[in-house]
């Protein structure tokens, strides 16, 4: 058989392989030239840091899953910025499941992602579809005009009047105090704060006093935690979020929504409550109970977990450094004494400078949402990350995702917080350099999507911290506790191994 015949036979038998190779090569060439054209058009440069994690980015996906399971994904995300070819450039490009993903901790890039005229350049891409089975059409899943309209309604519900009555927190603190005093030895305070956070949230949202003896309460809390596990997995899978949709997830969503429907109905049947009730206020704008439920679910996620985790990480740090608690108690004693909570008000709590410094420092080291993602609605650029020194703009194609890791920004010694950025030091917040940080400090996001409940969370946490300092002389960390703590990254971040401590009464 001649060479010509052999070649013809090979082509005939393996035409599909040749066709795919030809198609793949041609598409790569076209993509290269199209990218070059776009870079010239948008005056962008190639990214200086590019991490190639193998074919299709499959290795990167499995590595992220492994760290997620081991509760080391946050530390892994931070380390990636330190292990790029040029660590002084705070942006890199990698490939995940076939898609090029931009990761950044650069405040200038983050500012573009968050502060462009709303919905102009970036949105949340597949995030809405990924979490919608759990959160419905809540504020966290809406985009565009629907989001604007809903946020406009909700914004008015977080004014000064709705959070002014701080003494409403006192019965809940007494419940927490009773639980703490009933413990023998070391116990996980994070679990107690999660219970407290849910009870506070339900009273604020539904006007109901709900405790563990309410029917299906335990089922709800377990299902809610499971929903958050699934939501995190679905977000990680990106375009393939639909793969994480088994019967456990569907069942958990049903339990959560049924419990919330029950609370909405009970709340609407009792409108005589003279306190501020979120559902009652929302019902003035709509009679759609499903819509009310969906907003309530988003608010539960934001309020219950954010406050609980802020308090848990605060106690974790105070239990390791007793002088901070002593300094806190001195400030409280000098202003109001250690015996009575009667003088605590919205305004007086905001005047506790060291209380605010402790909470700011906790939020710096342990932000409630340590990472986030945006997707380009059109081809555009980020201001930094390209060129020979990383100071040139880089291209962001339509549909391309950009992840920003706020905790990496907070812990970077170069960007703002100095060589001791990994050290819990509340006194840093009295330095003049801590003013007007902009996107260098993002405990509650920034721009149009800044957390509506920011003041509520801070006042609630301030009240609890002051009352704990008035009640307990010391808090002691378990001698076997690991530090820094492993961080479980769901939608919010919590201590993966809990916060085991022991309280000592005054």
Curated annotation (Swiss-Prot):
<dbReference type="InterPro" id="IPR017972">
    <property type="entry name" value="Cyt_P450_CS"/>
</dbReference>
<protein>
    <recommendedName>
        <fullName>Cytochrome P450 52B1</fullName>
        <ecNumber>1.14.14.-</ecNumber>
    </recommendedName>
</protein>
<keyword id="KW-0408">Iron</keyword>
<dbReference type="GO" id="GO:0016712">
    <property type="term" value="F:oxidoreductase activity, acting on paired donors, with incorporation or reduction of molecular oxygen, reduced flavin or flavoprotein as one donor, and incorporation of one atom of oxygen"/>
</dbReference>
<keyword id="KW-0560">Oxidoreductase</keyword>
<dbReference type="GO" id="GO:0005506">
    <property type="term" value="F:iron ion binding"/>
</dbReference>
<comment type="function">
    <text>Together with an NADPH cytochrome P450 the enzyme system catalyzes the terminal hydroxylation as the first step in the assimilation of alkanes and fatty acids.</text>
</comment>
<dbReference type="InterPro" id="IPR036396">
    <property type="entry name" value="Cyt_P450_sf"/>
</dbReference>
<keyword id="KW-0349">Heme</keyword>
<dbReference type="InterPro" id="IPR047146">
    <property type="entry name" value="Cyt_P450_E_CYP52_fungi"/>
</dbReference>
<comment type="similarity">
    <text>Belongs to the cytochrome P450 family.</text>
</comment>
<dbReference type="InterPro" id="IPR002974">
    <property type="entry name" value="Cyt_P450_E_CYP52_ascomycetes"/>
</dbReference>
<feature type="binding site" description="axial binding residue">
    <location>
        <position position="451"/>
    </location>
    <ligand>
        <name>heme</name>
    </ligand>
</feature>
<keyword id="KW-0479">Metal-binding</keyword>
<dbReference type="InterPro" id="IPR001128">
    <property type="entry name" value="Cyt_P450"/>
</dbReference>
<dbReference type="Pfam" id="PF00067">
    <property type="entry name" value="p450"/>
</dbReference>
<dbReference type="GO" id="GO:0020037">
    <property type="term" value="F:heme binding"/>
</dbReference>
<keyword id="KW-0503">Monooxygenase</keyword>
